[in-house]
Curated annotation (Swiss-Prot):
Posttranslational mods: Predicted to be exported by the Tat system. The position of the signal peptide cleavage has not been experimentally proven.
Top EC class, one word: oxidoreductase
Sites where the protein binds substrate: F794
PROSITE patterns (UniProt xref): 4FE4S_MOW_BIS_MGD, MOLYBDOPTERIN_PROK_1, TAT
Main localisation: periplasm
Known partners and oligomeric status: Component of the periplasmic nitrate reductase NapAB complex composed of NapA and NapB.
Protein's name according to its UniProt entry: Periplasmic nitrate reductase
MF (Gene Ontology): 4 iron, 4 sulfur cluster binding; electron transfer activity; iron ion binding; molybdenum ion binding; molybdopterin cofactor binding; nitrate reductase (cytochrome) activity
Pfam annotation, one family: Molydop_binding
Organism from which the protein derives: Shigella boydii serotype 18 (strain CDC 3083-94 / BS512)
A GO cellular-component term linked to this record: membrane
Cofactor note: Binds 1 [4Fe-4S] cluster. Binds 1 molybdenum-bis(molybdopterin guanine dinucleotide) (Mo-bis-MGD) cofactor per subunit.
General function of this protein: Catalytic subunit of the periplasmic nitrate reductase complex NapAB. Receives electrons from NapB and catalyzes the reduction of nitrate to nitrite.
SMART domains on file: Molybdop_Fe4S4
Length: 828
């Protein structure tokens, strides 16, 4: 669109006047720009992190041409972060995939062949053959899927149905296993229900913010802007930031704490001890609403059973616990004295006391925020449990301005991975595959034979890598994720399985990522507003958007791929005879007919869409697929504390926070007057537990799986930077973001660099026991590691830092610890 200088100035003047009058800028744009087709604006949640910012998307002539913060969005109130402003450009990279690609030689599939353009029918032909062969020869455990916290809600639901009900395989897991699994298990252990009890409105009412392993200034910048506003507007507000290295969030900190890796467990127990020793327990809350339990210890590190660390563990993978008295709990935390804590953590005593006083002060409303520093941790579940302890001891929970809050990193890690239940052990609404009653509920709702869903937990993310390497998992489909770059221990545990000739790997992606280029078949995927979608953010807010443009070429949404592929299988090909005998009416039907084109899902006509409304999947099928899938899925949570609103309500609103009961969303769960599931007179009720009480756990410090030694003498921590998101497969295709941070660097303390004869800008080889990468020395800038630790982001495909990382996981959540392994440096 071209504008004369006069028109441009006129547009700016009108926009400024409109802003002053409180009018929306898109309306002004339509009024001013008359030379060509006007830009059409519609709402959508941002494509990036779990904050869930609302944006206005401008489309013209079939392309997304503009994006701005939505002033009516309650999350961001019209403000975007730097990534959000460049959303249109993520869709139009020069190497966007538009047609399926198969490795071929001499006209047919070959594992060592070159990628060759094929049709969708050809792609599904080879997929069908590979899936059916694996199912026939080795059974459902030989196939698997790795999905995403970036799936829309109905994409995740469709995938879970296809694998768990259709193929009878629980080998489906999301990449949220790498980021949110510890939070999930922590919530379930303490409260019996997943996801935070508070919301973002807490920010404007809190007196203190404590960040545990969360660089919100770069990873959740819009929320950080709200915290900054609260801190700078009120001199009595305090910010404490804890990390293993100094980062941009420290710029606002009143108490910036650098601790030795893994010793956050010590600090958490010290604060609990401080609260007890200073008689700061909220006795009324504690006596009515809390139970105490002692957890199993020495639980291993989630490595292969043959690993020496696993052999040495007394209780590998144990989630066991037993009741304990308050006196026993008091004695347990009493060992974590101020002196011992300062010694183990390297944190000055006065800083530790200042931190503990925030929680102990009955007049201070405290919010605890955390992300990957807690979750990507070999004791991540414990860390989650221990921070809940502090809020439960003091009663600072489920009320405006105070509570524990786990922040998510992906746009629908909550709404899709967690709530839908795309983990290998989960079903919708916090149900699990190991519970016969839960399986029965799903099987009846889905009208499939009893016993269809396997009771055995499937392979989690890291276990999938190991099974591929071992030749046990032979057909593997990944969607909306770049795990060859993002997952741990690439050299030893991932690449061997992907390139094993016994295995067939399918990657659905918009771009030729590291994962796509390591696959055998690449399926081009529609992204963001090229499809109708729904995400669920960190504060339980479910948000919808409409399809606003069509995908380029033959790119198709993940939902289309799943549903169309299901047509290739009849029930007799995937279910044993004893199951078919229970529902003989399903014989001869395709999985498409059994799972998707059912009376329950297909009852909403496509005529519910406006005539000019894009919806490629529904118009092709002849019914409103997204609405049918959502309403079927939402049934599982309604009446059980996971209530979602009717489908149409979300297109009208800027998101709603569940539980949504009688048209009203819930800001604070578990407290009387805020949560519709808490009756008058109950005060608080943690209704995920049978007795309505939350659990305080006694859990000790246990060391990291791998620490520096004489040879590998530095800690390595990995993470992100503001300008790029995860592996950079979208943001590195935005020229402005790429120029702002073009390549990964190794952040290192100047004295550590000097001791190794390294200077800023030097090339350096970073070496672990598993691999090596070459990076660039950075002794200045935004991240300032202490001596003994280096930090490296993972967005750069040319510097695969996960060649270095260890595939140790939290044994309870199976989430990888990307924050702690040992490396050495060699000058290049």
């Amino acid at each position: 669109m071209k504008l004369s200088r006069r028109s441009f100035m006129k547009a700016n003047a009108v926009a400024a006047a409109a802003a002053a009058a409180g009018l929306s800028v898109p309306g002004v744009a339509r009024a001013v720009v008359g030379q060509q087709e006007a830009i059409k604006w519609d709402k959508a949640p941002c494509r990036f992190c779990g904050t869930g910012c609302g944006v206005l998307v401008g489309t013209q002539q079939g392309r997304v041409v503009a994006c701005q913060g939505d002033p009516d969005a309650p999350v961001n109130r019209g403000l975007n972060c730097i990534k959000g402003y460049f959303l249109p450009k993520i869709m139009y990279g020069k190497d966007r995939l538009t047609q399926p690609l198969l490795r071929m030689k001499n006209g047919k599939y070959d594992k060592e062949g070159e990628f060759t353009l094929i049709t969708w029918d050809q792609a599904f032909d080879v997929m069908e053959e590979k899936f059916k062969t694996a199912l026939k020869e080795k059974g459902p455990e030989s196939i698997g899927m790795f999905g995403s916290g970036q799936w829309t809600i109905w994409e995740g639901y469709a995938a879970s149905k296809l694998f768990k009900a259709g193929f009878r395989s629980n080998n489906i897991d999301p990449n949220a296993r790498h980021c949110m699994a510890s939070a999930v298990v922590g919530f379930m252990r303490t409260f019996g229900m997943d996801e935070p009890m508070g919301c973002y409105d807490d920010i404007e009412q809190a007196d203190a913010f404590v960040l545990w392993g969360a660089n919100m200034a770069e990873m959740h910048p819009i929320l950080w802007s709200r915290i900054t506003n609260r801190r700078l507007s009120n001199q009595n507000v305090t910010v404490a930031v804890l990390s293993t290295y100094q980062h941009r969030s420290f710029e606002l900190a009143d108490n910036g704490i650098i601790f030795t890796p893994q010793s956050d467990l010590v600090i958490l127990n010290y604060i609990a001890n401080y609260i007890i020793q200073n008689n700061a327990i909220n006795q009324d809350f504690f006596s009515k609403h809390v139970n105490l339990r002692k957890g199993a210890t020495d639980i291993g590190y989630g490595l292969r059973p043959t690993h020496p660390l696993e052999k040495a563990a007394k209780n590998p993978g144990s989630d066991a616990s037993e009741p304990m008295s308050f006196e026993d709990y008091k004695a347990f935390v009493a060992e974590y004295t101020l002196e011992k804590t300062a010694e183990m953590t390297g944190v000055p005593k006065d800083q530790l006391e200042q931190l503990a006083q925030l929680y102990a002060d009955p007049n201070k409303k405290v919010i605890s925020y955390w992300t990957m520093g807690f979750n990507q941790h070999t004791r991540g579940v414990w860390a989650n449990n221990l921070v809940y302890n502090l809020h439960l001891l003091t009663g600072k929970i489920s009320q405006p301005g105070c509570g524990p809050f786990s922040l998510t990193g992906q746009p629908s890690a909550c709404g899709t991975a967690r709530e839908v239940g795309t983990f290998a052990h989960r079903l919708p609404a916090d149900m699990v595959v190991t519970n016969e009653k839960h399986r029965d509920i799903c099987e009846k709702k889905w009208n499939i034979p009893s016993g269809t869903i396997p009771a055995k937990i499937g392979l989690h993310a890291v276990a999938q890598d190991r099974a591929l390497k071992d030749g046990k998992l032979n057909v593997y489909w990944t969607m909306c994720t770049n795990n060859m770059q993002a997952g741990p221990n690439i050299n030893e545990e991932r690449m061997p399985g992907w390139r094993d000739p016994r295995n067939f790997i399918i990657v659905s992606d918009p771009y030729p990522t590291v994962s796509a280029l390591a696959a055998d078949l690449i399926l081009p995927t529609a992204m963001w507003v090229e499809k109708e979608g729904a995400y669920g953010n960190a504060e339980r807010r479910t948000q919808f958007w409409r399809q606003q443009v069509q995908a380029p070429g033959e790119a198709k949404s993940d939902l289309w791929q799943l549903v169309q592929f299901s047509r290739r299988f009849k029930t007799e090909e995937v279910w044993p005879e004893d199951l078919l005998a229970k529902k003989p009416e399903l014989r001869g039907k395709t999985l498409y007919e059994v799972l998707y084109a059912t009376p329950e899902v297909s009852k909403f006509p496509v005529s519910e869409l406006a005539e000019d409304q894009l919806n490629d999947e529904s118009r092709e099928l002849g019914f409103y697929l997204q609405k049918g899938l959502f309403e079927e899925y939402a049934w599982f949570g309604r009446g059980h504390g996971h209530d979602l609103a009717p489908f149409d309500d979300y297109h009208k609103a800027r998101g709603l926070r569940w539980p949504v009961v009688n048209g009203k969303e819930t800001q604070w769960r578990y407290s009387e007057g805020n949560d519709p599931y808490v009756k008058a007179g109950e005060g608080y009720k943690f209704y995920g537990k049978p007795d309505g009480k939350a659990v305080i756990f006694a859990l000790p410090f246990e060391p990291a799986a791998e620490a520096p030694d004489e040879e590998y003498d530095l800690w390595l921590s990995t993470g992100r930077v503001l300008e790029h998101w995860h592996t950079g497969s979208m943001t590195r295709r935005v020229p402005e973001l790429h120029r702002a941070f073009p390549e990964a660097v190794l952040f290192i303390h100047p004295l550590d660099a000097k001791a190794r004869d390294l200077r800023r800008g030097d090339k350096v080889k970073v070496v672990s026991r598993r691999g090596e990468v070459i990076s660039i020395v950075e002794t200045r800038g935004r991240n300032r590691p202490p001596q003994g630790l280096v930090y490296m982001p993972f967005f750069d495909a040319a510097q695969l830092v996960n060649k270095l990382t260890l595939d140790a996981t939290d044994p309870l959540s199976k989430e990888t610890d990307f924050k702690k392994c040992a490396v050495k440096l060699e000058k290049v």
